[in-house]
C-alpha cells in the first residue's frame, strides 16, 4: 500500500485524477521556493494542505510542516487554485510586465533596484512552473483585474486628474 502525494502549484484536475486512480492521496503546497524564501526563517512562510484525501496523509504533512515552523492553512482543491491565482499569478504577471518594459538604468532609484531584483528572481523560476501558475483557470480573471486597474490609472494620468489620482491612491492604500 502507498499514499500518493503531490506538492503542485496548481491542483486543477488532480482531485478527479486521484479519485480515478484508486489510491489514497494527500495534496499539499509549500507556498515558497528557493528564489525568495529565507530557508532559515520558515516561520515567515506558509503551506497549504488540501482538506480532501487521506486523513493520515494530511496528519503526516501537518506534523512535518509544524516541525518546520510553517504557517499551515487548509483549503479545498478549488480554494487552493483560487488562492494561487491571486497570490502567485498577480505578482508574476506584474513582474513580467515590468521586465518587458524596463531598460538599463545608469543611476536607478531604490524602488527600481528593488523591482529589478524581484524581476530577476521571478524570471529565474522554472519555465514550466511559471506556465503552470499562469495556466491556472482562475488566473485570467486576476489578469483582467490588472488590465482594468491599468486602464483606470492611464485615464487619470491622461487627464492629469489630481482629484482622481488622490481618490485612486486612497483606494489602493486602504
Locations of regions flagged by a protein language model:
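Rossmann-fold dinucleotide-binding core
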Residues: 5, 10-72
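An accessory alpha-helical subdomain
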Residues: 74-174
Amino acid at each position: 500500500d502507498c499514499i500518493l502525494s503531490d506538492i503542485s502549484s496548481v491542483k486543477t484536475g488532480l482531485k478527479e485524477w486521484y479519485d480515478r486512480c484508486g489510491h489514497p492521496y494527500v495534496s499539499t503546497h509549500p507556498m515558497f521556493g528557493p528564489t525568495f524564501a529565507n530557508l532559515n526563517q520558515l516561520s515567515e512562510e506558509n503551506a497549504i494542505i488540501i482538506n480532501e484525501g487521506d486523513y493520515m496523509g494530511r496528519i503526516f504533512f501537518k506534523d512535518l510542516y509544524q516541525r518546520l515552523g510553517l504557517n499551515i492553512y487548509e483549503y479545498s482543491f478549488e480554494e487552493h487554485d483560487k488562492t494561487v491565482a491571486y497570490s502567485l499569478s498577480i505578482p508574476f504577471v506584474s513582474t513580467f510586465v515590468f521586465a518587458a518594459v524596463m531598460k538599463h538604468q545608469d543611476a536607478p532609484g531604490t524602488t527600481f533596484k528593488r523591482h529589478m531584483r524581484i524581476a530577476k528572481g521571478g524570471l529565474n523560476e522554472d519555465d514550466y512552473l511559471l506556465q503552470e501558475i499562469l495556466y491556472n483557470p482562475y488566473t485570467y480573471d486576476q489578469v483582467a483585474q490588472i488590465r482594468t486597474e491599468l486602464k483606470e490609472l492611464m485615464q487619470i494620468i491622461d487627464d492629469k486628474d489630481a482629484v482622481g489620482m488622490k481618490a485612486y491612491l486612497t483606494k489602493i492604500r486602504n
